[in-house]
Amino acid sequence: MDIITLPEDLSIQNENALCIYDYQTSKECLKQMVTLQKNTFSFLIQGNKEVFSNKNNTNINHNSFLLMKKGRCLMTEKITLTEQKNYRSILFFFDNEALINFIHKNNISYVKSPVKKPSIFTFDYDGFLEVFVQSLISISKLNYKVQSKLLETKFEELIVYLINTQGTDFIESLLFEIQNENQHFIEVIEHNKLNKLSLQELSFLANMSLSTFKREFSKHFNTSPSKWFLDQRLEHAALLLQDKSVRPTDIFEEIGYESLSNFVQAFKIKFGITPKQYQLN
């Protein structure tokens, strides 16, 4: 699967600290690999969006929008309503320099050494933000020089509003760079252990080649990825089956198996008994 690099791959001038794009498509995509070169607001207008990152994943509809820290992620875009022909999102890109300049200009206080925070933030629309997004749509139709001047004002307007309504957590997260590569790797694995991502997708989120990912995995977990993820899924299945009302037929697909028989066989190999026997004990 090709990797999309944003905003570089869009037909816009993106050398400035701020740029905008009215993204519309009639095609859905599933777990598209995306490299965000800048921090990005995705103001969803039509459709459904799901994003996987190294720290968290989220799913939104047109009632919400996302702030995503620059880096790598997987994106799923779906057209949800039958009367809609397109998926549509207004993308507002900004680099860290734009944010730092804003902080200095406005004397914004924030925690400089934050504890681990998400790399994706979700916000719900309100009346002010709905009007704000409409103004971005209008700006996106203007020529580049006019856009660049107006976006500086719109960026400050947006950040001021979000700080006053949401606090500064999102700013702290944007400015926090992960120092420990091992921590980053473990976060990717632990957060996605039940998400049924391929090794290629996981290595992408970990910012590694597939061969390096396998090597690092063996070093950290002393086993192969396939065996470790299998064990994690089966442990999760055992936890779910502690609820006597849960049947093996209810969970085998959630655990990542294509058939009930394969799930039962794998469960018996690990625990020595079938899922049904496990529940009876």
Regions found by a protein language model. Give the residues of each.
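N-terminal regulatory/effector-sensing and dimerization cores
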Residues: E15-K112
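A short, N-terminal "cap"/entry segment at the start of jelly-roll beta-barrel domains
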Residues: M1-N14, L30
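Short, Lys/Arg-enriched, Trp-marked, Pro/Gly-tolerant hinge/linker segments that flank
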Residues: P114-G127, S140-N195, Q200-L205, K219-K227, ...
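Aromatic/histidine-rich interaction motifs
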Residues: L30, N106-V133
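Terminal helix-turn-helix DNA-binding modules in bacterial transcription factors
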Residues: E187-H191, K196, Q200-S203, K219-V264, ...
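Short hydrophobic/aromatic patch on the recognition helix
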Residues: N63, F213-F217, N262-F263, F267
